[in-house]
Swiss-Prot record:
It comes from the Bacteria. PANTHER family: M7GPPPN-MRNA HYDROLASE. This is RNA pyrophosphohydrolase. One of its GO terms (molecular function) is mRNA 5'-diphosphatase activity. Residues 6-149 form the Nudix hydrolase domain. NCBIfam families: PRK00714.1-1 (NF001934), PRK00714.1-4 (NF001937), PRK00714.1-5 (NF001938). Belongs to the Nudix hydrolase family. RppH subfamily.
């Protein structure tokens, strides 16, 4: 299913552990890493698609995770021209994604990327929260930056800010907080 603008509806999944690390998955047969994601089928809600993709790509079921947060808006990225399939109609120019932040509540041994006949991933690891923003393929960086900033506002409280060990994490969290304060102050002053 492709929308009128040429974007395929899709879900993205960020799974975190108790240490607030996130699951980073290696594409099958490649040296390319990303979060699990997948298309939303006709007659399927975003949440239903997320659970289906979660099982297909990571072998996890609804009882293995808890939904912590869902992105407020659809986030879009365009595919590079070299990845466009011109033999398909309509042409898909990119993905529009609804993102889910999940907490793994079962043992990590339940994660199984190889349980289907054609797995999307052949490996995974836990990485620091902001690591994917720096490492994902270029055309997805903006979406990853936006979704991780949105999730950070939910996942990290101000008490945790002082305990973050990576300077970039401190810097990014600080900039997100400043933007929110600026927006809040601007909104307050414009309402008078």
């Amino acid at each position: 299913m492709i929308d009128f603008d040429g974007y395929r509806p899709n879900v993205g999944i960020v799974i975190c552990n108790a240490e607030r690390q996130v699951l980073w998955a290696k594409r099958y047969g490649q040296n390319s890493w990303q979060f699990p994601q997948g298309g939303i089928n006709d007659n399927e809600t975003a949440e239903q698609a997320m659970y289906r993709e979660l099982y297909e790509e990571a072998g996890l079921t609804p009882k293995d995770v808890e939904i912590l947060y869902v992105s407020k808006h659809w986030l879009r990225y365009k595919l590079p021209k070299r990845l466009l399939r011109h033999d398909n109609r309509p042409i898909c120019i990119g993905q529009k994604q609804r993102w889910f932040l999940l907490q793994l509540v079962s043992d990590e041994k339940r994660i199984n990327m190889q349980h289907t006949k054609s797995p999307e991933f052949d490996g995974w690891r836990w990485v620091s929260f902001w690591y994917p923003v720096r490492q994902v393929v270029t055309f997805k960086k903006d979406v990853y930056r936006k979704v991780m900033k949105e999730f950070a506002l939910f996942l990290f409280d101000t008490n945790l800010k002082s305990r973050l060990s990576v300077p970039e994490e401190k810097k990014m969290f600080s900039s997100v907080k400043k933007k929110l304060i600026h927006k809040k102050n601007h909104k307050y002053s414009s309402n008078q």
